[in-house]
Swiss-Prot record:
Encoding gene (name): nusB
Lineage of origin: Bacteria, Pseudomonadati, Chlorobiota, Chlorobiia, Chlorobiales
Family affiliation: Belongs to the NusB family.
Family matches, as Pfam families: NusB
Domain of life: Bacteria
Protein name: Transcription antitermination protein NusB
Amino acid sequence: MKTYRRQIREKILQALYTLELRDTDIDSAAGWLLTPEILADPKAMKFFNLLLGNIKEHMEEIDRYIAAHTFNWDMSRIAIIDKNILRMAMAELLYCDDIPPKVSINEAIEIAKKFSSTDKSSKFVNGILDAIFNALKEEGKINKNGRGLIDHTPPRAAKTDAKS
């Protein structure tokens, strides 16, 4: 069975973009974007509903995290595509326990490269998500268990000068 997660992320991004520009609800905006292959795949639909549901339910909280880490940027000044990529990745980081944080961040970067109008968008998305992820990790708000879900690499020891 094929995995459609990237395609689903792209469809959700398109739905969020539509929502910003048109007077419609998010379910309608997302519904007409789904392909027959996604609709026929129960695992794909489960992921779609989980991710979209978490974005809808937690958008205010997600936006607060983004706003807190976009210094000197008002949320209204962030490009619509970039803002919605950040929202989607944040929903994955916070509420999709089976997706490693690095995967969520990498997917956001790749989608930014594909959909954003400037080359700097992927760097912007990467920087913001990295800062938010590090803050969430420090606060103990990333609750992912299982192999590969959290990087347990110990921090490097500070280099000492051997000439003392």
